[in-house]
């Protein structure tokens, strides 16, 4: 690994690789395509982020002046949600702290102008959601013809959200000799089919026990409480009163339920925030900041936002 990346990670206390990173890095650094099957929280971002950054040149770095594609995106990371895009971009920026590589986030729910301006100034790595990436390509602001590394993260979620056709459009606009890394917690048929069409002899890496089919890592303790729908808030209140529970995320199936539960818990005296699709992007980011900063310690969210991935890494 490059000294600059190692030093940047060491400054954040990252000195040893997680299992998915130890498995991924030797293969990815050879430029091979990878299908990584790993759950959330296993550290896969640096598993693909470090090879991506090492294959990218920033302004003023050795070889930059001779690169005919200087200033154009060389790396692309596609994710299903804004929150995940922000999280991954922040992790890549941490690893690239001692480099001049410019990392630009593009996602919906925000004005086009700042994102267009950032791309026009030059971006070596673009991290974004499928819809906004396609919009910017259609506006001829985003050129992916020089991208050498593509990462498809949380591919099964992109399938669930109906984004795979958009992902195929994006891949079709990149060069055929690119390196492609696909990561997914599960491998439904549509994701496998996508990999077969757009990847070249990929190495399959599985960072979990073959017999472990659960969606969560083994360190997550799971408990089921059976209760009548009318008593759910009361039961939640009693659970939340547990001593030393720390910050808590409650997932709800619908936007209406998330809003109602947050309101009911707030009325019972809990510092509660809500996060769902009826809120604007600014309101969602404000709710996440409040949760990270401890202003609220209970966050009620719809399942599609997957806040456990994007909010914080401390105890939840």
Q: Which residues make up each language-model segment?
A:
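Conserved helicase RecA-like core
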Residues: 1-315
């Amino acid at each position: 690994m490059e000294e600059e990346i190692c030093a940047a990670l060491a400054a954040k206390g990252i000195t040893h690789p997680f299992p998915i990173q130890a498995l991924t890095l030797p293969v990815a650094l050879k430029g091979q395509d990878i299908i990584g099957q790993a759950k959330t929280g296993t550290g896969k971002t640096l598993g693909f982020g470090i090879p991506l950054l090492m294959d990218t040149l920033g302004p003023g770095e050795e070889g930059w002046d001779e690169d005919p594609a200087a200033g154009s995106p060389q790396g692309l990371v596609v994710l299903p949600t804004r929150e995940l895009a922000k999280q991954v971009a922040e992790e890549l920026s941490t690893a690239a702290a001692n480099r001049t590589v410019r990392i630009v986030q593009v996602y919906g729910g925000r004005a086009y102008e700042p994102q267009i301006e950032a791309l026009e100034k030059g971006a070596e790595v673009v991290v974004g959601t499928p819809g906004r990436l396609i919009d910017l390509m259609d506006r001829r602001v985003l050129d992916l013809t020089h991208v050498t590394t593509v990462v498809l993260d949380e591919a099964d979620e992109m399938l669930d959200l109906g984004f795979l056709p958009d992902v195929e459009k994006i891949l079709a606009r990149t060069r055929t000799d690119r390196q492609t890394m696909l990561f997914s917690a599960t491998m439904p048929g549509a994701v496998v089919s996508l990999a077969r069409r757009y990847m070249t002899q990929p190495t399959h890496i599985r960072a979990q026990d073959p017999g472990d089919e659960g969606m969560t890592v083994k360190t997550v303790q799971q408990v089921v409480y059976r209760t009548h729908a009318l008593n759910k808030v009361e039961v939640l209140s009693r659970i939340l009163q547990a001593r030393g529970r720390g910050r808590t995320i409650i997932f709800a199936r619908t936007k209406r339920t998330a809003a109602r539960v947050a309101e009911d818990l707030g009325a019972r005296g809990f510092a509660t925030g809500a996060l769902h699709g009826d809120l604007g992007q600014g309101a969602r980011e404000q709710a996440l900041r409040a949760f990270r900063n401890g202003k609220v310690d209970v966050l009620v969210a719809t399942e599609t936002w997957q806040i456990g991935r994007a909010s914080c890494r401390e105890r939840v």
